[in-house]
Amino acid sequence: RYRTIVASDRLTLSESFRRAGWSTVCVAPANTYAWPEGDWYGFDTVYDSRNLGYAGPKFGWTTMPDQYTLTAFERLEHGRADRGPIMAELDLLSSHFPWDSIPEMIDWDAVGDGAAFAGMPERVDVPDEPRDAYRMSIEYSLTALFTYLERHGTDDTVVIYLGDHQPATTVTGPDASHDVPVTIVAKDPAVLDRIDAWQWTDGLKPAPDAPVWPMESFRDRFLTAYGPNGS
């Protein structure tokens, strides 16, 4: 299915931003080799584990902590004085299975090239129970994201964050659905007013009766809400 989609002419959300004159960036620290499909997705620039400048240790499967990924994005793209409007996809890895090595937050000013994380994978005590370890990883990942936004978000910043799939069955149990929560965060109330008709739950936790959509439907709903004819 992946080969089928990248051989198609489907318009991606990132390509839509590129056509509108935005700079489009993908930060994919899990990638350890070239990803030519990035151009099909509409990304002007792709960063991966080879060019993000990380000099610290791996955390199990994870090539670098989320706090470093966000720091590198700020240094390389978002914090540049000469940049225009930017649309970026950032893949945050620290909550990914198997949760056997989870980072801790450090002072943002100490992150540097990641050398400050030396010894942390061995030092941090991770719970043996998978659900507890998963919860710890989610707490870390969201803390990294939210504190980054507190430091570097602006009045114009809009964040859409979601998981691309549910965790392993050791956490969810055998009968879990494929549903994942998605949240839009913005300082400008007008941004959220555009999606009132979606009937999403305020806050970070969807209500039991919150609408459930296929992920592929998000593009059209988003472009309709925020396009020139959006309400």
What are these regions (language model features)?
Residues 1-231:
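Solvent-exposed soluble domains appended to multi-pass membrane proteins
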